[in-house]
Regions:
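N-terminal ligand-binding/catalytic initiation module
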Residues: 1-185, 191-193
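Conserved small/polar residues in nucleotide/adenosyl-binding loops
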Residues: 199-205
Length: 205
């Protein structure tokens, strides 16, 4: 199923329960901004390959958009749109002052060298540098991206802007301003959710 169609169906269900006005529903169903980019990367064999990527920013009503960047051969625009919307909802549920963002590059890192992954990382950041930033949109790691990729992207953004800007990216290596515990944070959050669910189940049984 198309993830963008799925999230729109979920919004319809929630809107019906909450009795939201139709114009609010239509606003929520559409990301504020979706950027599609293509950029050249020199491969190890000397050839030049064009990569495609996307960045979706769902809403910045509560603050900058926030969400991961994934490297995967199956990345689509509809996927990143849906994921950016789910990020908005996740931030809203826990009261974080962020909207949802998500991005991705169509590539298969399993077939690429470290140098090629670095050049793709830097090339994508160069392509989206005008629409991200500490006060605009803050990317993070996701599928097949990691602290090293975030470090390359942060370095590229800082070079473009002319000043050191660690706030543009989360999930960076500690040595360049990353946060302790970031690698374990998602799994730890799942643990807390399971514990809370078990407590709730016992209370309601």
């Amino acid at each position: 199923l198309n993830p963008y169609e799925i999230v729109k169906q979920q919004i319809d269900v929630a809107a019906n329960i909450l009795q939201l006005p139709s114009h609010v529903v239509e606003i929520v169903k559409r990301p504020k901004r979706v950027v599609s980019v293509s950029f050249p990367v020199k491969m190890d064999d000397g050839s030049v390959r064009i990569f495609e990527g996307f960045r979706s920013q769902h809403t910045d009503v509560l603050g900058p958009t926030k969400g991961g960047i994934r490297f995967h051969p199956d990345v689509t625009m509809d996927e990143v749109k849906a994921l950016s919307m789910w990020m908005t909802f996740k931030c809203g549920v826990v009261g974080l002052p962020y909207g949802g963002g998500k991005g991705g590059v169509i590539c298969d890192v399993k077939t690429m060298s470290r140098g090629e992954v670095e050049r793709v990382s830097r090339g994508f950041m160069e392509a989206i540098a005008d629409v991200v930033g500490p006060e605009k949109d803050i990317p993070a790691p996701d599928v097949y991206t990691n602290p090293q990729v975030m470090g390359w992207m942060m370095d590229t953004y800082s070079r473009i802007k002319g000043f050191y800007s660690p706030g543009v990216i989360t999930g960076k290596p500690l040595i360049v301003g990353g946060s302790k515990g970031r690698n374990e944070a998602t799994a730890q959050g799942c643990v807390y959710a399971i514990i809370a669910d078990r407590k709730s189940t016992r209370l309601n049984s």
